[in-house]
């Protein structure tokens, strides 16, 4: 397995995806969350984004379905990330930034209901975009916030994917 987490597009370092794509001795890539970050263009870890030509879209914080779709799309334009997705199966789980910083069951540190509406609406559109862009099969399509699943790699490893963020954190 190749394991990665915390993929902040403006900061760069997606070259690791190209290296994963070159590996011929792994069964899968495992992304442990923060596949995208919701911050606006001048937000967290963006100081080098202009020089690296890695400006996020939309330039605002992601809040709407269109925002989240655009953010996934800009990430997927990265040639190294495309190479990894083409070369190896991806097993993924979300953390907080697929929704908003420090998300929990009913809200997030980086969500203001007064200006961004109810967190439940943001959570719903973030979940929809996640499932549109990420290769995750649901055990129950009526419960898109339940991504518990298991993967067996022969008799060597049993990998159990858990959600310790959206439904596991109060």
Regions found by a protein language model. Name each.
Residues 1-170:
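Metal-dependent phosphoester/phosphodiester hydrolase catalytic core
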